[in-house]
Amino acid sequence: MFDTARIDHTGDVHVFAMREKGCAVRDVVWAEFHSPAGRLVRRPVSQLLREALEEREPVWKPVQYRGKQAIATWWRPAGAARHAGCATLEALAAARALEFDPEVATFTAWPVRLSWADGGGTHVPDFFARLADGRARLVVRAPGGTASGDWPEVLPLLDAAGRQAGWQVRVHTPADTSVAEAENRRRLSRYRHARLADAEAARLLHAAFATPRPLTEGVAATGLPELSALAQAHHLIWKQDLRIDWNLPFVPARSLVWTSTASRAMA
């Protein structure tokens, strides 16, 4: 996460630069994004505090062509009407991590293009997230191989954008999660959608897992229909309302599941 700084609202890039200690006009970051009406606009990032970029259309999409190493795929955040684009499998993992983060309310892909005021260097972050407390977060995936050539120039741009707009900035790398946790997230993410939520089933499942036990055993103890109860239990695990050891491969017939109260008792 990068540090944040005071947010200027004057709308004058020269005034902003003079008020920021040691900040020249060329160091001001500009943002290109779509207005609510769909018009492409460009402003200093310091003016974007009240812009709901998580609701805006992308300013960029990957071009697909034969022989390209990266892929273009899509992720639908739970409760969102629009899919978020992912240019690579690494970006897909970053989207899954955002979905899993309880701080994140919603997010979208590629809604803003950042550039220096003097026109030198541009970058489109992978994701823009709105947090539950109203703050904003930029998420970018760390490039690998030949794609990392411009990375030393991108990082200062992201850092400055975060400070001037008051955004968090996170760099997602594969090392952020263990292999087992990444695979568990991939498998359980299919149960993320709110349509699987059921208050009565949740009550019975919490009671069943008040003592740690394997998933299938606890589901059977609820007396609920097996298939629907399994789906609802997986949903609660994804939402982290039921706990598992994410760093071990999750096997429903063997892996222990418990409630937060049970986890305290185990400790």
Predicted segments, located by residue:
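Electrostatic, structured charged patches in enzyme active sites and in nucleic-acid/phosphate-binding
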Residues: M1-A267
